[in-house]
Structure formats: C-alpha cells, structure tokens
C-alpha cells in the first residue's frame, strides 16, 4: 500500500520530524519546553500580524494607534495583551529550556547548542525592538539608553549609534526601522528554529541520564505529542490567567504615558526578562566594561561545552554540581530583582556581588567541582 505519510516529499519530512521520530523513552517534562517555544513563536507571529494591521509606525500616531487597538478593534485588547504577555511566556520557556540544557548536559550537542545561542540573541533583539513600538515613556527611554550603549565601542561608536537611530536622536526614523525589523525577525527566527531542529535530529535528543538512548527508543507520536499537549494546556492556562486577570502585571506603568524626550522617567528599566543582564551592565561603573559584561553574560553560554570537565554528562548523579546549578539559578533571580531596583545603596553592592558570583560560578566553581567529583568517583 502506498502510504502518503511516508512517501509524499513534504509529508515525509513532517513524518520523520514529528510522528515516526525515534525518541528516548525516559525524557521528562523538562523536555516539553522546545515544543512550547514553538507554540509561543506561532502565537507571537499570529497576534503580531493582526496588531500590525492596525498599528502605525509613526511617532505622532504610534501611541494612539495602540490605544485604538485596545478600545476600538474587535478583541484588539486580547490580541495586544496576548502578544505582550506571550513575550513573557516565550522568555520563561526559553530560560527553562536553557537551564535544562545546562543541567542535563545537552550542550554537548554543540551545533544544536550554538544554534540555540544565535536564536537567543535574535529573540532578545526582536523583543527589545517590539518594546519600543508602543512609543510610551519606557519605550522611548529604553530605546535611547540601550542603543546608546553602542557608543561605548571605540572609534566607530558614535557614528554607529547615529546610523542605527537614523538621525541625532531616537525619532521617527528609529521607530519605522524598528517596526520593519520587528516584523521580519520572527520569520528569520522560524528559519533558524528549523536549522536548530535539523542539527538536533542529526544526533537525536539527550535524556536525563545523559547516556546513549539508541538501545531504547519509542516513536514521538503518540507518546510525546500527548505529553507536549498537556504542557501546552498548562502554558495556555498560565497565559490566560495573566491576560484575563492581570494583563499589566509584567508591564511598566510609565509606558501608559506617551513618549516625551524632554522628561526622563526616574527609573529606566527594560522588561523583566532582560533585568538580569541589565543588572550586570549597571554593576560596572565603566561604560565599555558594562557593555562587555552585558554581552559576556549571554555569550558565556558558548564556552560552556569547553568548560565541561565532568566525566558524566548529566548532573543527575552529581550532587555538588547540582548545588552550584541551583545557586546559579538563585543568583539569576537576585540579578533580576536588582535590575528593577533604583541605583542606590544597598542595591549597587548586591548587584556587584551577584554579578561577580554569576561569572565565578560558571567560569571557575562549576569546572572545579566537576574535577573534584571525578576524583571522588575515582575517574
């Protein structure tokens, strides 16, 4: 019998990726977040498309066009809040996805891991540009402060910033180009996701034990399709609780004030998912040093496969490494909290200590403890 699912050129690709894909039999719920990220991306593209139909990328009308979407467009309010809180869901899943990769040693699949880092940077750039579009106070000043960081680059910095702005300050040209980039980037992200999956399917998934799964595999469908569906339902529940009960919980009240270049808000801060990096940036008094620390805080992920000293791939049976992993998690929570606080004592000191601890844990303590564990296990 000619099975269309297995023989049709397009269906065959879908079949080998999502239906007959051999998957490890023991992957836990921490492996759900890849599919949840795919769902978040789809949600963002769909809601974003409908928002773009009513939004105007002009400094005089951008703010009122967002208000118009919420007030006059049919279900515009839910589309807008799904898009805004969808970004938070996206980053929540992203951080858990990366955390799982660190804990279970998935970074040893270097091509997939490096592709993931490129994806992280692209998603962060997209989210930043999206935050500028409503043209509220925090949008305008966030754009000014973050783009201004590029002026720390020696020699070409100032020219680079003015080139990005399209003038001598954040203005109409900046908003228009940010909208254009914000629209195109999710489609680039989709293409990168396909490459990410291509690399993953070359090697197959890791599992909680960190061992080879070749001896025991099960088909992706129905086992993991059902499992992913449960994760999706829980994510939808969380998203709907946010959107329908407290849609502005994660936003900034300052963004309900139209952008005013003549009045600076008392505390300029980005969305919650950038606060950890923002805290690291602020903890260094030097501008260039701060920018380097900011970039390093994310780029450090690229050298994690090199820093992996343990003979075991996963942290499942390495209690000392587990302690350091959860210390790192707690440290990131502290940095996120500090990023949202004003620049004054004691927050400055706490931020500096947390920033030093972040780099020390990853660069020194984790590799050292891995070597100690190897010795303890007589490896």
From Swiss-Prot:
Protein's name according to its UniProt entry: Cytochrome b
Q: Where is this protein found?
A: Mitochondrion inner membrane
Spans through the membrane? 33-53, 77-98, 113-133, 178-198, 226-246, 288-308, 320-340, 347-367
Q: Which UniProt keywords apply?
A: Electron transport, Heme, Iron, Membrane, Metal-binding, Mitochondrion, Mitochondrion inner membrane, Respiratory chain, Transmembrane, Transmembrane helix, Transport, Ubiquinone
Q: What's an example of a GO molecular-function annotation for this chain?
A: metal ion binding
Residue positions annotated to bind heme b b562 are 83, 182
The UniProt entry, under InterPro entries, shows: Cyt_b/b6_C, Cyt_b/b6_C_sf, Cyt_b/b6_N, Cytb/b6-like_sf, Cytochrome_b, Cytochrome_b_C_euk/bac, Cytochrome_b_N_euk/bac, Di-haem_cyt_TM
Another remark in the UniProt entry says: Heme 1 (or BL or b562) is low-potential and absorbs at about 562 nm, and heme 2 (or BH or b566) is high-potential and absorbs at about 566 nm.
Record-listed a ubiquinone binding positions: 201
Subunit composition?
A: The cytochrome bc1 complex contains 11 subunits: 3 respiratory subunits (MT-CYB, CYC1 and UQCRFS1), 2 core proteins (UQCRC1 and UQCRC2) and 6 low-molecular weight proteins (UQCRH/QCR6, UQCRB/QCR7, UQCRQ/QCR8, UQCR10/QCR9, UQCR11/QCR10 and a cleavage product of UQCRFS1). This cytochrome bc1 complex then forms a dimer.
